Every structure is written in structure tokens, then in C-alpha cells.
Amino acid sequence: KCAFVLVKTSNPSSVELQDMVAGDRLVYKVMGDLTERLARDTAGKYGYNVLGVVVGATHPNELKDLRRRLEKSFFLVPGYGAQGGTAADVQYAFDRYGHGAIVNASRSIMWAWKKTGKDGLDYQEAARAAAEQMRDEICAYVTIV
């Protein structure tokens, strides 16, 4: 079992809180470090701690920084697709083996049928195609060992 801590979310307004300075550090870095400290020595069979972090695909620099700092944390990465996150952005969420992250896309998959010009009755085919395209795009940047 695992819980996820909101560290740097994908929404544009995340800067209002998560980029504030707390002491001499940004709040999102404080939250990342706190998550690491609280989860220390909880790594399971595959090496990840029981506390994961939520870091948005729309913040690739923060993803890169936090992945370096939180090697044993699992990353939940919202914001792919409709919010603007790309495969090039999310590559930084994965560890050196191509593991340790779940990339989430909702609207870009659920509403993929709108791009087909059809009535949406076959929405599942459009959703499947969008999910497969997402997978292929990410695999172009992430090597899984």
C-alpha cells in the first residue's frame, strides 16, 4: 500500500503556494524532503518507499530536481496531454531503469473522440488510440530496463 503527497501539482496556480519560500527553500522542496524523511526505511520489495509524490508533468525542471532528490519515491505525474505536459517533460519522473512513475492523462484520452470528427459513439476506439499514442510517445524518451 502507498499514499501520495502533493508536492508540485500540474495546475497553473500551484505557484501560489508550492513556489512560496519557507525559510530558505521553496515549499515544494520542503514537501519533497519531508516526504523522504517520513518514508525513510519503508522501501518495499522493489525499492520504493510507501509514500509517493505527486509532481505535475507541466513542471519538467521540478520533476528532474525532485527525481534526483527522491530516488526511492514513486511519482504520480498528472498533467500529460490536455494540461500541456509532454513525453519530453515526463521522462524526468522515471528512474534510471525507466521505472518509478505513473503518468496520468484524463481529458486527452476521455475526449479523444472529439478529434475524430465523429459523434462519439465509438469513443472507446479513440480513447484506446490516444492511450497507445501516449504510451508510444513516452517510450520514445524512456528506456525500460
Task: List each model region and its residues.
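Short, low-complexity, polar/charged sequence segments that are solvent-exposed and flexible
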Residues: 1, 22-27, 72-75, 94-97, ...
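Conserved anion-binding
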Residues: 1-51
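Short, acidic Gly/Pro/Ser/Thr-rich loop/turn segments
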Residues: 10-13, 60, 110-112, 117
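Electropositive phosphate-/nucleotide-binding environments in soluble metabolic enzymes
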Residues: 25, 29, 60, 84, ...
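Generic structural signal for well-ordered alpha-helices
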Residues: 32, 36, 63, 87, ...
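Surface-exposed amphipathic alpha-helices with a cationic face
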Residues: 36-40, 66-70, 135, 139
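A C-terminal functional module that forms or caps the active site or interfaces directly
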Residues: 53, 57-104, 108-112
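C-terminal helical cap(s) of enzyme catalytic domains, especially alpha/beta-barrels
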Residues: 90-96, 111-145
